[in-house]
């Protein structure tokens, strides 16, 4: 009986140890990428793209949806930058609709190089999610509502491919246990 109890307790202890080791690797990956959700593939490079007043956004198609996404990106970065990025047919930050069955409808491929950033997707939804990842890669001061003068707007070089694992998205907001203002709920939804 004692031997059985000892063997059982050792098995439980070893299972806990191995489980802890595995989850620690996932946490290291999350800390390294600092992107939510963690993309399917991420490869970092030693280069960096720097946003300046001359930086432009390029749209390969004259789609109203892509123009809306470019306006959204400008709306997010304008307060901290103090200027808007011009939207043209070819630009330093290029949004391109392609035909890649591996990406699905909401997947994207984001490549940050020294001279250009490209976001490619099959549908505008994929471009939008690529822009969300790009916003997370900018320095944290980009969220400021006041112009930030002493910040270098550098984005680390990377090659990122991601698509949703499931066809739905969800997150729990428990408003019955804590009161949230309308603005907090809207911000929460935007973070999805």
Set out the residue ranges of the language-model regions:
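Bacterial N-terminal signal peptides that target proteins for export
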Residues: 1-8
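Repetitive helical segments and hydrophobic/amphipathic motifs
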Residues: 11-12
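A conserved hydrophobic secondary-structure block that centers on an alpha-helix together
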Residues: 174-191
